Amino acid sequence: MASKFLFAKSFATTALLAVVLALAIGFVKPGFTNDSQDKKVTIENIPTYKLELTRSSVMIQKSWNYLLSKINSISSSKLRAQVLSMYQNTAPTFMALYQTDKSKRTVYEKLLNEGLIDANTVSKENLFPELKKLTIIPQPFFTAPGGSLNEHHYYPGGLVVSTAINVKATIAALYAYKDLYDYVDLYDEAVAGQLLQACAKPFIYQWQDDFEVTEDYLIAGAKASQVIGLSESIFRNLPVNVIIAQACAGIPLLSAHDEKTIVKAIKAAAIIAGRDPIALGLLSFDGESLPTPHHQSWYVVGQSSHNEALATYAQKQAIEALKEVFIKTYGMKTSDLKDKKVQTFKNYIGSQYSFMRIHS
């Protein structure tokens, strides 16, 4: 059951309204202590359990509380509940459509016939990551990384931190518009779209026994984590403009080429969700462009979703620096750097201290 990944202990002093909302609909926060702080630990005693790493991190705690508070700030009660539900249940509900080999083959062939998938890189068997049961989440939102080893926020809880930074950027843009243009009518669409932009990563990036994660792949020229997330939002009947804003998070709407890429991602997502994107209003009547007029929220989410550029660079540089530490300080060989102990150490540094701080 999904509840076994969640903890009933909550903060009385942080994000109080978010906690009240969460408890009201059955969602509870992982248990932290109010005096959480960075603690010294020997390399032999580094925690390996993902929830243990995330529960002990001040950075992840702050990010998680922030996300809950911003979910609670959404004025629409229906949308607020939908977003919170997707944070609680990271098992894609649309997977109910794909419980047989025949159903998986059918959707795979549809994507293939529409030119939305490359048979050389993605097979029918690998179209969806493993999901043992619809009622068991692949992992909590809370433990997922923000990306793979060669991307960004690659540590347990990285998704929470990455999403929090992007949401902060989105809200900062909205406040700037309020201050300078004297309006902020985009709040619900933009904040919800940004909160959901990486909602499929707990499904896509599943931690393995060797402390690596399953890799992302491409659907319709976009990352599968983005397309799968859009499929889930479509299947759960989220508002059209929230879904399009979510689509623009990974592919900013800067040119006609970008729009074509977003359209392809939405087409693929709708096929997977078993819905008609034109009938839903996600695409124009000819299915070749986004509906007009464009909503400003789409652009706001797109322009505030690029923390990954710096985070990816910082992570790569930090990991290279850590390799030198392993070799010079601990006497390891290059061939030892894939050892579980090394992977555990990198996860610990990322979650407790951050690669950004190492790089700075």
Question: What residues fall within each predicted segment?
Answer:
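Classical Sec-dependent N-terminal signal peptides that target proteins to the secretory pathway
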Residues: 2-33
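Polar/charged alpha-helical tracts
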Residues: 6, 65-69, 81, 85, ...
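Terminal helices and disordered tails flanking the catalytic cores of nucleotide-processing hydrolases
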Residues: 31-66, 70, 302-360
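Acidic/His-rich, divalent-metal-binding segments that scaffold phosphate/diphosphate chemistry
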Residues: 38-214
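All-alpha prenyltransferase/terpene-synthase fold signal
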Residues: 59, 66-75, 81, 85, ...
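Surface-exposed polar/charged interaction patches
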Residues: 70-77, 89-104, 114, 180, ...
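Divalent metal-dependent catalytic cores for phosphoryl transfer on phosphate-bearing substrates
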Residues: 146-147, 155, 161-162, 176-320, ...
